Design a protein with these regions (language model features):
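Alpha-helical cap/lid subdomain in secreted, periplasmic
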Residues: 1-199
Length: 199
């Protein structure tokens, strides 16, 4: 599959890679489960980065580090469903730091989700639905961090939404009505002063 992607005539402009949370779980005594030992996780992430870098000189890459978890919430919401949940906050930190270090060495943009989510004083109670999976509030933090990278990265062309040109601009009956009350105004390329949630 990876080879067919590499041979495709059109390569992705942006790839966001997010692994580490499940990998950081403790190994189950049965030998099954999602645990990936730290050295193997690092090597897998290195291979993913090298593959993505080989796709095209214009394919941009952002890795997301392993986020924190709320161990107490996991015990309260998931222990009855999955038995003993072998995941700790500290293990997530170790995998997060490993991802950040690898990305630094490979010159790949990486978002430190471990730190970003914990910037909120109430992160333990607002960032998760079950101690692991993101709530809408946590998802907003992730989007904000991704947009920050897109805005600040010195990529040519820039991939930040405000710098992208309008490719399919056309007049529409649904555009605002002009001052003459007979025509519409194409707002596709208007520079409007406003504050938007996703600046």
């Amino acid at each position: 599959m990876l080879q067919s992607i590499k041979e495709a005539s059109v390569q992705p402009a942006l790839v966001i890679v997010y692994f580490g949370g499940n990998d950081s779980m403790h190994p189950h005594p049965s030998g099954i489960g999602p645990h990936v030992p730290l050295p193997e996780y690092i090597e897998n992430m290195r291979k993913i980065a090298l593959h993505l870098k080989s796709l095209s000189p214009t394919t941009r890459i952002i890795f997301l580090s392993s986020p924190p978890i709320n161990e107490q919430q996991i015990k309260e919401t998931l222990s009855g469903k999955f038995g003993r949940v072998n995941r700790t906050h500290e293990d997530c930190r170790v995998y997060s730091e490993a991802c950040l270090q690898l990305c630094y060495e490979m010159d790949v943009n990486c978002i430190d989700l471990w730190t970003a989510l914990q910037q909120r004083d109430d992160w333990l109670t607002t960032c998760f639905t079950d101690g692991i999976h993101f709530s809408p509030e946590a998802s907003k933090i992730v989007v904000k961090e991704i947009l920050k990278v897109l805005r600040e990265a010195e990529w040519e062309p820039s991939l930040h939404w405000k710098s992208l040109s309008t490719e399919f601009s056309e007049d529409s009956l649904y555009d605002p009505i002009g001052p003459d009350a007979k025509t519409t105004i194409n707002v596709s390329d208007m520079d409007v002063e406003r504050h938007m949630q996703w600046e």
